[in-house]
Amino acid sequence: MLLCAQYILPITSDPIVGGAVLVRDGRICDIGKVEMLKLRYPDEESLDYGTAAIMPGLVDLHTHMENSIMRGIVHDVPYTTWLASVASLSTKVEVADWYDSAILGGLDALASGITCVADITATGAACTAAQKLGLRGVIYREVGVMDKRRIDFAMHSAENDIMHWSQEVDTDRITIGIAPAPIYMCHPAVFGKVSELATRDDLPVAMHLAGSRE
């Protein structure tokens, strides 16, 4: 299939005006001027998007798709007030709601041109959403516990989730990782445990390195 448009944005090279992209079996096989590709592949079916731009999908490097239903509920307040409000509202959310919320977040991403996400989740809802919607990305299992006595249990639960999530997703598109929660939600020992697990199982790690001074 030749996908044609007024603009092709390869990103790694200059834009192509009046260009086309050859896609076969879900892979980009060629790119160039429409006329050139139609001569090169005369029997190829084509689809012309007209006055549009074809470009690689955008990447969202930090998202929480399962929290999408919280948008607009609490806003224009100090960070700590917002955080406490979201935490309180979260206790009223059913398991199925988290999955619906993650689907909503994934649809919002796709509508914005985002095709790859780095999502941090404690529920696993983002795994289901990414799998169903065809998103690419890294889904990080969040671990946050303040009580030192509960760290081993929290890590064991996270390890089990990571194993199960890895079996449920298309590993050609989705990678499972681990993420310690922000420092104000974690006992310091959690970071060491996360590092040990990530090193042992070769897991990607996401961390909140900055936040509000509050």
Regions found by a protein language model. Give the residues of each.
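Active-site gating loops and adjacent loop-to-helix segments of metal-dependent hydrolytic enzymes
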Residues: I69-D100, V138-K148, E159, S212-E214
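N-terminal metal-binding scaffold of metallo-dependent hydrolase/deaminase domains
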Residues: M1-R40, A52
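Metal-coordinating catalytic core of metallo-dependent amide/deamination hydrolases
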Residues: A126-E214
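Short, glycine/acidic-enriched loop or turn micro-motifs at the edges of active sites
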Residues: K33, T63-M65, A122, G211
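Hydrophobic "anchor" residues on beta-strands that sit immediately upstream
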Residues: L58, T115, P204
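Divalent metal-coordination and catalytic microenvironments
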Residues: Q6, V21, G26, T51, ...
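Divalent metal-binding segments
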Residues: G50, V77-A122, P180-V190
